[in-house]
Amino acid sequence: MPLLPLLSFARTIARTVATGCVLFAAGAAAAEPHVRIEAPAAGATLDAMEQNRLVYEVDPGPRGDHVHVYVDGEEVGILRQLRGSYTLETLSPGDRELCVKVVNKAHTPIGVQQCVKVRVD
């Protein structure tokens, strides 16, 4: 069997593997840990007399375990689902900051979070 077709085939395989590795690496980079608060939107006005819902989606990454919910820096909830909603207790009127933070198994924030500022009337 001639050696030239084998070398050509080997080069094609090597390029395919290299391209696949680059695509895999790019896909892995796209899956960075994140928190996304889908509702309420930043700047929204919430009704103080209603139960308001915080809708979220999280990828905790390899260092994260679950998430905590904060209102004005005070922890108000622990969430184990990566996607869902959380009913906020009655909020007093004024400007409020709602945060979802990824924490590790020791309940320590790992720096992956999102916060939104809202107005409660």
Spans of features found by a protein language model:
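Short, compositionally biased P/S/T/A/G/V-rich stretches that sit at domain boundaries
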Residues: 31-47, 121
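Surface-exposed, short loops/turns at beta-strand junctions within beta-sandwich domains
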Residues: 89-95
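Aromatic/hydrophobic beta-strand junction motif of beta-rich domains
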Residues: 53-60
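Beta-strand signatures of extracellular beta-sandwich domains
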Residues: 66-70
